[in-house]
Amino acid sequence: MLSILFIFGLILGSFYYTAGCRIPLHLSIIAPRSSCPFCRRTLTPAELIPILSFLFQKGKCKSCGHRISFMYPAAELVTACLFAAAGIRFGISLELFPAVVFISLLIIVAVTDIHFMLIPNRILIFFLPFLAAARLISPLDSWYAGLLGAAAGFLFLAVIAAITHGGVGGGDIKLFAVIGFVLGVKMLAAAFFFSVLIGALYGAAAVLTGRLAKRQPLPFAPAIAAGSILAYLYGDSIISFYIKMALG
């Protein structure tokens, strides 16, 4: 099963990266077919094979020789690994469906935020019915836990945005509402903590290495995605570990 999830993740990861690059530009995610961003030549089926095509072509376009962004194979590999991690965590269970849908959403919004500093409403709206169906299939502790989580996620980020005078974007606020719906209040708090920690560490490293100016805006969705997935898959284990450490 893990190999199937991994391969499935490779294929969808390629599609998710393309979708994340096209949706903010109001382009179709289906047509035209993928092409080289430099010479605009339509890629052949062999050039669309996840990971392998990048390796065989040595990271370059066969036609014009320009280097292909490493983000393409990175998105494929990250999605594949996360799908497999969900399979390891939940096995063949009802919770595997919301896990795959949730990871898919977070991969796409991470891509849009990296490239455009934007989390389009249409992506969140598209995924809402699937996440709602997923929570009907595999509910949280109570039927209202998801609604409480959504309200908590929205209000908490909205308050932070008001205090920081726009330090948090509207897309981040709505994304956290969706995350709260999926995770519930308890894991939402863990997701927020992990997200802030990851974002702070990345931001500090980027400033120290000169990749980011001190006051330059930083896309927060990738950190939110990483922190939320960490909380979703391993939050209970991490919390239990620290409680045991605190109690000696």
Swiss-Prot record:
GO biological process terms on file: establishment of competence for transformation; methylation; signal peptide processing; sporulation resulting in formation of a cellular spore
Reaction(s) catalysed (UniProt annotation): Typically cleaves a -Gly-|-Phe- bond to release an N-terminal, basic peptide of 5-8 residues from type IV prepilin, and then N-methylates the new N-terminal amino group, the methyl donor being S-adenosyl-L-methionine
Keyword Zinc found: yes
Annotated residues for binding of Zn(2+): 36, 39, 61, 64
Keywords carried by this UniProt record: Cell membrane, Competence, Hydrolase, Membrane, Metal-binding, Methyltransferase, Multifunctional enzyme, Protease, S-adenosyl-L-methionine, Sporulation, Transferase, Transmembrane, Transmembrane helix, Zinc
GO cellular component, one term: plasma membrane
EC number: 3.4.23.43, 2.1.1.-
Main location: membrane
Membrane topology listed for this record: Multi-pass membrane protein
Induction: By several proteins including Spo0A, Spo0H, Sin, AbrB, DegS, DegU, ComA, ComB and ComK.
Subcellular location: Cell membrane
TM region positions: 1-21, 68-88, 90-110, 114-134, 143-163, 178-198, 223-243
Names of the cofactor(s): Zn(2+)
Cofactor note: Zinc is required for the N-terminal methylation of the mature pilin, but not for signal peptide cleavage.
Origin superkingdom: Bacteria
Molecular-function annotations in GO: aspartic-type endopeptidase activity; metal ion binding; methyltransferase activity
Disulfide topology: none
Protein function: Plays a role in type II pseudopili formation by proteolytically removing the leader sequence from substrate proteins and subsequently monomethylating the alpha-amino group of the newly exposed N-terminal phenylalanine. Substrates include proteins required for biogenesis of the type II general secretory apparatus.
Family (UniProt): Belongs to the peptidase A24 family.
Designated name of the protein: Prepilin leader peptidase/N-methyltransferase
